Every structure is written in structure tokens, then in C-alpha cells.
Amino acid sequence: MANSAQARKRARQSVKQRAHNASLRTAFRTAVKKVLKAVEAGDKAAAQAVYQESVKVIDRIADKGVFHKNKAARHKSRLSAKVKALA
């Protein structure tokens, strides 16, 4: 249990930030699933459009520090390869 006022405040902040980060991770997973679903459907135009949106989401989350930039790059690369394979 936090004893000082500073420690109590940091505990409150960490709870709030944890919830926010969880919502960002959920948005990330949803974006990736949308791309994979479009790829499985075989719709190249839709897959490219959804991929562009997912890249924005992934980059935004990496910029905020929720994920490491290398993790973001890895996911973008793998999604891009799947979209390009539809040709």
C-alpha cells in the first residue's frame, strides 16, 4: 500500500494509464484482425484500404510507447506481405 501522497497519486495514475493502454492494445488487435479477414476473403482493394488504416493505428500506438517500434514494424511488415501476396 502506498504511504506517501506522491506514491498514492502514482498508483492512481498507473491504474488509469493501464486501462488506457489496454484499450489501445484492443484497437491494435482489431486492426490486425480486419486486415487478416480482408486477406482471407481475397479482396485486394479492401485489404489495401484496411491495411492503410491499420498502419495508422499501429504507428500511433508505437509512438505512444505502448509497443516497441520494432514490434510495430514487424507487424506492419507481415501484414504488408500478406496483402501483397494477394496479387
From Swiss-Prot:
Gene3D superfamilies: Ribosomal protein S20
Keywords: Ribonucleoprotein, Ribosomal protein, RNA-binding, rRNA-binding
Keyword Ribonucleoprotein attributed: yes
Keyword RNA-binding among record annotations: yes
GO BP annotations listed: translation
GO cellular component, one term: cytosol
Region (Disordered): 1-22
Biased composition (Basic residues): 7-19
Gene Ontology molecular function, alphabetical: small ribosomal subunit rRNA binding; structural constituent of ribosome
PANTHER family: 30S RIBOSOMAL PROTEIN S20, SMALL RIBOSOMAL SUBUNIT PROTEIN BS20C
Family, per entry: Belongs to the bacterial ribosomal protein bS20 family.
Role: Binds directly to 16S ribosomal RNA.
Name recorded for this polypeptide: Small ribosomal subunit protein bS20
Lineage of the organism: Bacteria, Pseudomonadati, Pseudomonadota, Betaproteobacteria, Neisseriales
